[in-house]
A protein has these predicted regions:
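Short, Lys/Arg-rich nucleic-acid/phosphate-binding segment
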Residues: 231-234, 347-351
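A short, conserved structural fragment
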Residues: 339-349
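Short beta-strand motif preference
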Residues: 10-12, 123, 353
């Protein structure tokens, strides 16, 4: 098996939201300004503790995500990103991306984020249809989505990923096509399509979501977008999400924050989900880390397969052998099951996700 990757990506989990709303999944925190500031300081403390352990990896991409990280103090977010640049070995062309909700995008926020040299924004628009944003109870409207895009353009931030949802209550193929037409018309560099997986009433079922997904893929192809990984569409290779591309090429994962997951130097880690514990002990792994496990060759081989399918859409057998050695019975079994399910096609010495597989792995 080849040496452990020296490339890595860094994910910073900020699960804060302004208030509890329907149609959300995952761990979310609602806190006042003091709690948010305390969390950002805890992230900086964890980064200082973790960075020396990760060397000699080179960070190809940094992604700040989670709940609504753009509601945090823009200046403090900028300071956090500057800390990460000083503590970790970032590649010269490192992608630094931030998930943002439309109503938080403006001159103050873009100025603060700019201090941290954010060069990619993931705009979580969900939709541009007014009735669908109302159905989702989002704290912004379609006008604010348009304004956010104008501000991003004004600040010459051309690497924008517009994240949209399918499966919204009341959504139809026609309404999704209108959204895609409107968004494609502003010529974003990247589009992300994500299923609405919340258990709230009204969410479209899996069969209906599959129809919407297939129709969206066909329409985006006609607009010149290429789907390079499940739910990820780019006009050209230059604007593919480097965070995903790097994971699909075997980069290690370093996670900071509550619930963060890491996988590097042959070990996997999961951080605590307890805010009080994390805020008080983020710099102390014996308290901040809830679980740790060693990755044997079998686990690393499965991770290779799953990351390359999830973030790269597939892989060549020769790449697998180069990275992991001869295919084990466990890996062969998993791939055979995916083939039988119709999610993976094995052809010409490569395993690739089918259209059905792209839909399944986007979920």
């Amino acid at each position: 098996m080849e040496a452990i990757s020296r490339d890595a990506v860094l994910f910073v989990n900020i699960p804060f939201v302004s208030e509890e709303r329907p149609f959300t999944t995952g761990h979310r925190l609602v806190g006042d300004r003091a709690a948010r500031m305390r969390y950002l300081e805890a992230l900086r403390a964890e980064a200082r503790a973790v960075a020396p352990e990760t060397r000699p990896v080179v960070i190809r991409a940094v992604k700040v995500g989670g709940g609504s990280p753009s509601i945090m103090s823009p200046d403090k977010l900028g300071e956090l990103l500057l800390d990460l640049r000083a503590l970790f070995d970032l590649a010269d062309d490192c992608e630094v991306s931030l998930e943002a909700v439309p109503h938080t995008v403006g001159v103050p926020s873009l100025t603060g984020w700019g201090q941290g040299k954010v060069n990619r924004v993931i705009l979580r628009a969900d939709s541009v249809q007014p009735e669908e944003l109302v159905a989702l109870d989002r704290p912004f409207d379609s006008v604010q989505v348009q304004n956010a895009l104008l501000f991003l353009d004004k600040f010459h931030l051309g690497n924008v990923d517009v994240a949209l949802r399918y499966g919204i209550p009341g959504q139809t193929e026609a309404s999704l096509m209108r959204t895609l037409r409107s968004v494609a018309g502003i010529e974003p560099a990247h589009l992300t399509l994500e299923p609405l997986l919340a258990a709230d009433e009204g969410v479209l079922d899996e069969e209906a979501q599959r129809r919407l997904y297939d129709a969206a893929c066909e329409r985006l192809s006609s607009y010149g977008f290429v789907q390079y990984a499940p739910g990820r569409f780019a006009r050209d290779e230059l604007h593919r999400e480097e965070f995903a591309v790097a994971l699909g090429q075997g980069a290690a994962l370093i996670g900071l924050g509550i619930d963060a997951r890491s996988c590097y130097h042959g070990l996997s880690y999961v951080n605590t989900s307890d805010f009080a514990v994390y805020a008080a002990h983020s710099a102390e792994p014996q308290h901040a880390v809830a679980a740790v496990a060693q990755l044997d060759e079998g686990a690393r081989a499965l991770l290779f397969v799953r990351n390359r399918l999830a973030f790269g859409g597939g892989f060549a057998e020769e790449d697998y052998v180069r990275a992991c050695g001869p295919m084990s019975a466990e890996v062969a079994r998993e791939l055979a099951e995916l083939e039988r399910a119709g999610d993976v096609a094995h052809d010409g010495g490569a395993y690739r996700l089918t259209q059905q597989g792209l839909f399944a792995w986007a979920r």
